[in-house]
Amino acid sequence: MTPTLRVALGEYDTGWHDPVVSLARAEEVVRSAAVSDAALVVLPEMCTTGFTMDAAQAEPLDGPALRTLGRLAASVRVQLLAGIAIQERSPEGKTQLANAAILFGDDGRTRAVYRKQRVFAYAGEDAVYTPGRAAVITEVNGVRLAPFVCYDLRFPELFRAVAREVDAIVIIANWPAARRSHWDTLVRARAIENQCYVVAVNRTGLGGGLTYDGGSAAYDPWGEPLTPTGVSVPCVDIDPARVRAVRDEYPFLRDYRAAP
């Protein structure tokens, strides 16, 4: 029988430059999701600090916030995808920062690290963070997925590059309310054009002078909305068989050719 994956959309108000507050809120979300039998919980971009250009907020992959998130995942036996600003060494041995999406296994160990490929020059992100060079495809309970971060959403070629290899795309973001209509449209478009599930998790609240109003959502491979209403932590089920059925009936991806 084809495996399915229950994913929780962990939207919350991130504490600005306040990992203690942020991690406490994240724990509430994760524990609530576990009660709903979620196997994967998705948290927003930079989920411990908010979207910040303060290099001092970044931490190494073995830093305290990451250790806390790993322990949290292990304590409730869920996998956890969380956005963190990380500090690491470049191949040349220099210190560099990345806006990352990190997948923790249900044993608390880091399973995958995706680095945001398109940094947001409009906000000065390009002056602080080094862009990632490649997509990351991983598997959670037999379901193939690729994580992306916020501004990546505006570049459809990034998603098309992995479409045939995944069942789901997961987007984590700090997407301001002022551009919410773009978020709503682009998230759904990525599901329709790539014929796969899309799970997109945004934050709420205030941070860095900006207002965030959530809008976390999930769509099936036909672009139909899946996000339940009236629950604090919504969950959706990813079914690879549905992806195959849509692609077999409407084999649009077979006709794809890269532009000359």
Task: Please tell me what each predicted stretch does.
Residues A39-L40, L145, A168:
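Structural motif
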Residues C235-P260:
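Short, basic/aromatic-enriched C-terminal tail that caps enzymatic domains
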